[in-house]
Amino acid sequence: MLPNSIKKYQNSTDLLINIAENDLYSKLIIQLTKDFGLANYDLKISEKSTPDTLKEALNNAIKNLILTDSNTYKTILYIIDVPEEIIQKIDTSDINNYVEAVVFLILKRVWKKVWFRAKYTN
């Protein structure tokens, strides 16, 4: 389900809708909250939030961090393990498109962590 299929998603909305249909959606939210917490950023997202709510919260958090606290933003990317070379290739001419692309990369990476942990634990 994951390794090759994750490439078929074009944006975070498509990815989140698929994840929400999966039993691991709440674990994705828990992992996101944990990763942001490790960077001392309080990401307030309920495990019962909808994919749209989650996407909006992540977009707002990332945009806020880019504009006000670049060190925490970079720390979050490091903790989540988003490749720096991919981040550097994103077009920065429009902040909203940039944020959407970064959120998509974050969600893909965290989803991989959650999926692999669920598949290979037990």
Regions found by a protein language model. Name each.
Residues 1-29:
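N-terminal leader/targeting peptides and immediately adjacent processing regions
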Residues 18, 22, 44-52, 92-96:
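Conserved phosphate/pyrophosphate-binding and hydrolysis machinery centered on Walker-type P-loop NTPases
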Residues 87-122:
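Amphipathic alpha-helical binding modules
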